[in-house]
Amino acid sequence: VGDIDVDKVEAAVKRIFADIPAPVNPAKREYTEVADNDKPLVSIATDKEASNMVLSIFYKHDKMPKELYATAAGLMKDYMENVVETMINERFAEMMQKADPPFVAAQASDGDFMIAKTKGAFTVAALVKEGEIDKALDALVTETERVKRYGFTASEYDRARINVLKQYESLFNAVSYTH
């Protein structure tokens, strides 16, 4: 968002932080392992100042090792996650077009399990209408189970594939333009 004089900024950073000594024995950064669970875990958090109700369901899974991110396997995993997210989010969007939708908004995504760095999760979440949490929960679980059992149609995949590839092309062009 503008031109930066790299040499000037680097000199300023060195000047500002020069007097801060490096730690002699820095603590090793450790991440707590998140355990799997056999039965669903349920948690309800309330806030009297919150104006919306949000329902989230996390389907935990192991994460891909970091050393594979920048490989063909990492690219394929990223592509598959994006296509699946696009397809299920399109289904949620269609549900919201109905006369009495089960939620105000819904979204699926795959990433870290909450703030954990050691466990991934496929997450479905919805903005819920007052008094309709059961309706929203049923819709989210039903749709994710439908995907698990039956997958997606060829036409859903074709539309999602085209959209995801367009996103990759736009990202590539943006990065190419800036470098």
Model-found features: residue ranges?
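An aromatic/glycine/proline-enriched structural segment found at the starts
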Residues: G2-M53, R159-N173
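M16 family metallopeptidases and their MPP-like homologs
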Residues: V1, S51-A72, F92-H179
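Long, His/Glu/Asp-enriched segments that create or flank divalent metal/ion-associated functional microenvironments
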Residues: K77, E81, E85
